[in-house]
């Protein structure tokens, strides 16, 4: 795994900075493409269902679940 890469996404009208390993960004990009949504829309979907879990952790878990892990 590489070092963290930050991206800024707009969630519910607010710019949010999210730091993930490049491998997780690549996985989320693939998922967004498969679902025909933007990366921001995908992360918004993850954000809504994450509960108390930090957003970065929720994104990693989501990517692993979608990968079958």
Map each language-model feature to its residues:
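Surface-exposed, Lys/Arg-rich phosphate-binding patches that contact polyanionic backbones
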Residues: 23-41, 45-48
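Glycine-rich, flexible loop/turn motifs
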Residues: 5-7, 42, 51
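Short, well-ordered coil↔helix boundary/capping segments
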Residues: 18-22, 33, 53
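Alpha-helix N-cap/helix-initiation sites
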Residues: 17, 39, 52-56
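C-terminal structural segments of small proteins and small subunits
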Residues: 48-69
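Aromatic side chains
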Residues: 14, 24-25, 62
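Short Lys/Arg-rich basic patches
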Residues: 1-19
């Amino acid at each position: 795994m590489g070092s963290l890469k930050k991206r800024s996404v707009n969630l519910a009208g607010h710019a949010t900075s999210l730091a993930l390993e490049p491998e997780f960004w690549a996985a989320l990009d693939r998922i967004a493409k498969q679902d025909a949504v933007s990366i921001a829309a995908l992360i918004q979907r993850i954000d809504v269902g994450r509960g108390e879990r930090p957003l970065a952790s929720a994104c990693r878990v989501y990517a692993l679940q979608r990968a079958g892990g």
